[in-house]
Structure formats: structure tokens, C-alpha cells
From Swiss-Prot:
Mg(2+) 2 binds at residues 191, 227, 231. It catalyses: (2R)-2,3-dihydroxy-3-methylbutanoate + NADP(+) = (2S)-2-acetolactate + NADPH + H(+); (2R,3R)-2,3-dihydroxy-3-methylpentanoate + NADP(+) = (S)-2-ethyl-2-hydroxy-3-oxobutanoate + NADPH + H(+). It is an enzyme of class 1 (oxidoreductase). The active site is at 108. Binds 2 magnesium ions per subunit. Its cofactor is Mg(2+). This is Ketol-acid reductoisomerase (NADP(+)). GO terms for cellular component: cytosol. It comes from Frankia alni (strain DSM 45986 / CECT 9034 / ACN14a).
């Protein structure tokens, strides 16, 4: 079973006298920086001189430096920019200032797991990854609660890396809810698999295939949209709140019978075998190499596939129907 740490297992005293730099001010960056500051941590934000986020961070009372300046000052450097930017930011702005005794932290393990960043041996390397978007991390913190986080230690040069990671997690509110111990490998591989096979790739492909099946059988696209895309949120919300069993309890008997008898005909053993292939590509580095090469090459195939997806008929139907839904923010 996973080990879970709470407020009593962590101490902000570990961060006393230590300077923290949060590199990036996007969804997670702003939440980490503001929560740490409100927890009494000495924090500064590292942003490029031309970043549009500099003014916002300054307006919110944070000290704003360049990534290099922030890294030079800090004892603990948390890198919270997009994965594809990490290598350059690390090489240009962090590595020259990453002296022995410092700590390098991440919100996702991708670049460490696949060896794209290799910190020196004398540096602690840890991860604190909230299991929720930044705006939720900030809002719940202000309410006196927290969002669960994953914590991991990749390199414990100081012998105190876990205590530092837990103190950081406490500073952003994570130990209020629970900090689950994991590894960089487990976090990275499961996160990528979830995105590709279930949450993003799997769900979007399933929705499109269902929509196409109904339209090709002669049903109106608008009704197909409601049945295959729009109502998905209703079901996911039930699962989110109480699991699959609670969702099944909440739907009609007809829907539940169709679920348990027809669902396995959609996600067949062949589908699960393909899921395993996707997982194997994540574990052996095939996906990482493919994605890094695609990004380094200007993302031609990625851009083409995204643009093709925008042309799917379900997008046009949705654009026509969503204005009818007053509860959706426009």
C-alpha cells in the first residue's frame, strides 16, 4: 500500500532560512508560489524578461527575477514550465547555478525519468505533483484545505531530501489532504499512460467513434452529439464523486444493464492488449524519444493531427449546440 504523509509528518521549519525559486507562472507555478508565500516561505519567481506573466506575478506581490537570477539566489529550485522547455531552461539558467547542497524539484517526472536532465550528484532531486489543476490548488488552499499531492525523491544527496519535499508539499497545502509517496518512474509512466490510453486519447477516440457510428447509421448529428459527448460529463462526474459502483447506482437499471453487458464488448481483450503496447512504449522510452524528436523538429505531424481533429464533424456540431447551453461559460 502507498505511504501517505499528512501535516503532522511535515515541518515548514525545514524550509526556514532557505530560499525557494519557482520557475514558471502558469497553472501550477502561480499556485505554488502564492501558497508558499502565504505559508511564510521565502519565495521568488523566475520568468524571462519578456514574459507576459511578470506583471501578473509582481501585481500579486511576488518578487520576480529571470530564471537564472532566481536559480542563483535559491537553495531550492522548482521547475514548473512545460516539459518541452525544461532542457533549455535547465541548461541555460539552472545548471550554471546548481551547486552542491541545493535541491532541484519538479512537478512531473518526464525529464528525469527519460534522462533528458541529469543533475549533479551533490544535488537533491525531488518531485511534488498536485493531483489537480493550479487554480484548484490555490482556491482550496485559501479555504484552509488542500489538494492531494504525489511526492518522490530521485536523489537524496543531503540525506534530508524527503523532509524537504514534504515541507514543500506542506507549504502548498498538499499535506492537508495527503502526500502520497511514489517514484519519478511510477508518476511519469502512469501519468503518460492515463493521458494516452484513457483520459485524453482513449476518451476522445471513443467519443468520436460513437458519434460516427450513430451518424453513419442515419441518426441526426445533433442527437448523436448529446448522447456521445455532452452527456459524458454527467457520467464522469458521478464516477469522480463516488467511483464506478456509485455511478452505476445512480443511473437507470436499463443503463446499468447495458453498461455491464455491452461495455466489455467495446473494450475487448484486443483493446486491452493495445493498451499494454502503449504502456510498453512508455516504459521502454519509445514514446519519449518520438515526442522529443517531434518537438525538436517543429512538431509537423503533431500539428497536422491536431488540425485534422479540429475538422471532425463533431466539432462543428458542438459549436452549433453549445450556445443553447446557458450554463456553459462563453
Amino acid at each position: 500500500m502507498v505511504e501517505i504523509y499528512y501535516d503532522d509528518d511535515a515541518s515548514l521549519d525545514v524550509l526556514a532560512g532557505r530560499k525557494v525559486a519557482v520557475i514558471g507562472y502558469g497553472s501550477q507555478g502561480h499556485a505554488h508560489a502564492l501558497n508558499l508565500r502565504d505559508s511564510g516561505v521565502d519565495v521568488r519567481v523566475g520568468l524571462p524578461a519578456d514574459s507576459r506573466s511578470r506583471a501578473k506575478a509582481a501585481e500579486e506581490g511576488l518578487r520576480v527575477l529571470t530564471p537564472a537570477e532566481a536559480s542563483a539566489e535559491a537553495d531550492i529550485i522548482m521547475l514548473l514550465t512545460p516539459d518541452t522547455t525544461h532542457r533549455k531552461i535547465y541548461a541555460d539558467s539552472i545548471a550554471p547555478h546548481l551547486s552542491e547542497g541545493k535541491a532541484l524539484a519538479f512537478g512531473h517526472g518526464f525529464n528525469i525519468r527519460y534522462g533528458l536532465i541529469e543533475p549533479p550528484a551533490g544535488v537533491d532531486v525531488f518531485m511534488v505533483a498536485p493531483k489537480g489543476p493550479g487554480h484548484l490548488v490555490r482556491r482550496v488552499f485559501e479555504e484552509g484545505k488542500g489538494v492531494p499531492v504525489l511526492v518522490a525523491v530521485e536523489n537524496d544527496a543531503s540525506g534530508n531530501a524527503l523532509a524537504v519535499a514534504l515541507a514543500y508539499a506542506k507549504g502548498i497545502g498538499g499535506t492537508r489532504a495527503g502526500a502520497l509517496r511514489t517514484t519519478f518512474t511510477e508518476e511519469t509512466e502512469t501519468d503518460l499512460f492515463g493521458e494516452q490510453a484513457v483520459l485524453c486519447g482513449g476518451a476522445s477516440a471513443l467519443v468520436q467513434a460513437g458519434f460516427e457510428t450513430l451518424v453513419e447509421a442515419g441518426y441526426t448529428p445533433e442527437v448523436a452529439y448529446f448522447e456521445c459527448l455532452h452527456e459524458l460529463k454527467l457520467i464522469v462526474d458521478l464516477m469522480y464523486e463516488g467511483g464506478i459502483s456509485q455511478m452505476r447506482y445512480s443511473i437507470s437499471d436499463t443503463a446499468e444493464y447495458g453498461d455491464v453487458t455491452r461495455g466489455p464488448r467495446v473494450v475487448t481483450p484486443a483493446v486491452k492488449a493495445e493498451m499494454r503496447k502503449i504502456l510498453d512504449e512508455i516504459r521502454d522510452g519509445t514514446f519519449a524519444r518520438e515526442w522529443v524528436a517531434e518537438d525538436d523538429n517543429g512538431r509537423p505531424n503533431f500539428t497536422k493531427l491536431v488540425e485534422e481533429g479540429k475538422q471532425h464533424p463533431i466539432e462543428q456540431v458542438g459549436a452549433k449546440l453549445r450556445p443553447l447551453m446557458s450554463w456553459i461559460a462563453k
